[in-house]
Amino acid sequence: MLKLENLSVKVKDTDNLILDNLNLNINNSEVHVIMGPNGTGKSTLSKAIMGHYKFDVVSGNIIFNDEDITNLEVNERAKKGIFLCMQDPTVIEGVSNSEFLRTARSEITGEKVNLFKFIKDMESSMKDVGLDSSMLHRSLNSGFSGGEKKKNEVLQLKFLQPKFIILDELDSGLDVDSLRIACENINNYMEENPETSVLIITHYPRILEYIKPDYVHILMDGKIQKTGDYSLAEQIEKDGYKMIGIDA
């Protein structure tokens, strides 16, 4: 599904290279995790895949479903089925939650949205993720707590039906109950859409108690330095990076 080939990425308009010839291959139905110390490029990786304007691909390729998307704009990548659950979701004043999702869904599917069914489905889904239905008519993420913003990202995921999901520190700002509910919704989505693949960016293995990974990768110095299974994340939690031979 997603292949990163010798991907090097820098901060736009600088010489600050963050990712250096990084390689990663994620197949259909797989859950991959990126872990690593602060400042190693984990969030840069997620934004580079999504096509964030603050980063430039210096060399290498981003291949999605056998198509080179390296030079595509963010909206074009979203239409192809890539979704980024952001670490700090953007506030958009004057655009309601329902208006945003209805427009985004119509853009991605190319179909006109039935308003009555949409509102009914959205109210049900908001209940599933633990959001009050009054937030349906509020400006996107305006006045939302950190946890509410993350729940709103999961709500968007359910409605936009992506093929590839990037969870950039979903567990940051969520209490135990909220994290469990968010992960239950993501797991249910993956069960209903079994070819969906997920890339989890995280510092801590807590989220992996709810979403079970196939592979855990350690990112350091712009490259993946080590790959393992869930036990690798447990080992890092217990002993730190130095104990597995990575000098953080």
Stretches found by the model and what they are:
Residues 166-170, 177:
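Walker B catalytic motif
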Residues 219, 223-246:
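Conserved beta-strand-loop-alpha-helix hinge in the C-terminal portion
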Residues 179-194:
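Helical segment within the ABC ATPase nucleotide-binding domain
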Residues 61-77, 141:
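ABC ATPase NBD Q-loop/coupling interface
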Residues 157-158:
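ABC ATPase C-loop
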Residues 1-4, 8-21, 25-28, 33, ...:
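A short, flexible loop at the N-terminus of ABC-type nucleotide-binding domains that lies
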Residues 84, 88, 94-109, 118-121:
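Q-loop/switch helix immediately C-terminal to the Walker
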Residues 35-37:
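The feature captures the beta-strand-to-loop junction immediately N-terminal to the Walker
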